[in-house]
Amino acid sequence: MLYLKYKRYIMDSIDSRGLLDLVKYPIITDKTTKLLEENQYCFAVDPKATKINIKAAIQYIFNVQVTGVNTCHPPKKKRSIGRFVGKRPHYKKAIVTLASEDSINLFPET
C-alpha cells in the first residue's frame, strides 16, 4: 500500500513539458508488429528515461492507460564505411503494454 502511494506521488509530480522529448519514435519491425496483437507497442526512448517517466509520457502523448513498461539497452552494432569502422549510436528500447480497451494508431489511413 505504501509503494502504491509513493508511485502515485511520483506520477503526479512529473512535469509534462519534458515528456514529449522522452519518446523519440516507434520501432516497427516484424517482431514488433507481432507484439501489436498482444497490445504491446515498442518505442525508442531517451537512454536516461526511467520506466515511470516513459509510462507518464505515453499516457500524456497518446491518452491511453499503460499497464506495464519493459526496457532494454540493445548492444551497439558495428558499421563500416569504406575502411573505417564505427558503431551506431546508443539507444534505449521500451516495450509498453496497454490496457485491453486502449490502442495506438501507428499506421494512419490515407
From Swiss-Prot:
Keywords: Chloroplast, Plastid, Ribonucleoprotein, Ribosomal protein, RNA-binding, rRNA-binding. Gene3D superfamilies: 3.30.70.330. Pfam families: Ribosomal_L23. The keyword Signal does not apply. One of its GO terms (biological process) is translation. GO terms for cellular component: chloroplast; ribonucleoprotein complex; ribosome. It is found in: Plastid, Chloroplast. GO terms for molecular function: rRNA binding; structural constituent of ribosome. Its main location: plastid. NCBIfam families: PRK05738.2-4, PRK05738.3-4. Binds to 23S rRNA. Belongs to the universal ribosomal protein uL23 family. Part of the 50S ribosomal subunit. This is Large ribosomal subunit protein uL23c.
